[in-house]
């Protein structure tokens, strides 16, 4: 079993960035997880992100690109598109995003707008996850996804959770949600373990670099 060092690079709002802590382990034994957040339809910095992702993929064979929500609403060019959010979906497909979860502002135009965005993008190549919205939207998402890392015995699990405390209550008709407290996390992770083999200390070394 090959030990795998996992490095997390978090890029909030796609601001100017550089990796604060360059991994020192063998590239073949390193997993890079690049995480973006709160893109809000911002297209301007995607060339920078594309350059960063390209550089890491050139150096490391195992790179995952994920987003933690609030991604497709917040820019008039994206909001007013005939298919709301389509420009973002096209760019995220081109960059090779693996997983995206839903944020509170992804419901700013209501649940039907979110459903239309998801169901109207059949070409979406990334998995959209959420495990704590129900019942009206639950069929739109996968609650979690397990991604096997090629050439290793490791799979990485992503669980999507949304905090809707700041969402307009008028957009919440028919939706119930659970705050991601300790018990909720436990219930979801227990379900996840039924479908995959959990990481153990012998199969992975965690090394976190946040920027």
Model-derived segments and their meaning:
Residues 17-19:
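Sec/Tat signal peptide C-region and signal peptidase I cleavage site
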Residues 7-15:
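Bacterial N-terminal signal peptides
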Residues 1-7:
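Bacterial N-terminal signal peptides that target proteins for export
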Residues 2, 12, 27-28:
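Residues at the start of alpha-helices and the adjacent loop-to-helix junctions
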Residues 21-211:
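Acidic, metal/ion-coordinating pockets
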């Amino acid at each position: 079993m090959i030990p795998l060092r996992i490095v997390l690079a978090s890029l909030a709002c796609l601001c100017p960035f550089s990796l604060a802590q360059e991994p020192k382990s063998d590239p073949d034994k390193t997993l890079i997880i690049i995480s973006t957040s709160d893109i809000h339809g911002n297209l301007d910095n995607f060339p920078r992100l594309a350059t960063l992702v390209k550089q890491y993929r050139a150096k490391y064979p195992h790179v995952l690109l994920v987003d933690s929500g609030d991604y497709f609403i917040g820019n008039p060019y994206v909001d007013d598109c005939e298919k709301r959010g389509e420009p973002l979906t096209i760019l995220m497909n081109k960059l090779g995003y693996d997983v995206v979860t839903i944020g509170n502002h992804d419901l700013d135009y209501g649940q039907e707008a979110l459903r239309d965005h998801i169901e109207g993008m059949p070409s979406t190549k990334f998995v959209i996850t959420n495990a704590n919205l129900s019942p009206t939207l639950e069929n739109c998402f996968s609650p979690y996804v397990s991604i096997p890392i090629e050439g290793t015995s490791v799979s990485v699990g992503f669980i999507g959770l949304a905090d809707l405390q700041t969402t307009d209550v008028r957009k919440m008709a028919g939706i119930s949600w659970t705050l991601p407290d300790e018990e909720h996390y436990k219930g979801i992770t227990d379900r996840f373990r039924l479908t995959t083999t959990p990481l153990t200390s012998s199969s992975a070394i965690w090394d976190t670099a946040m920027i």
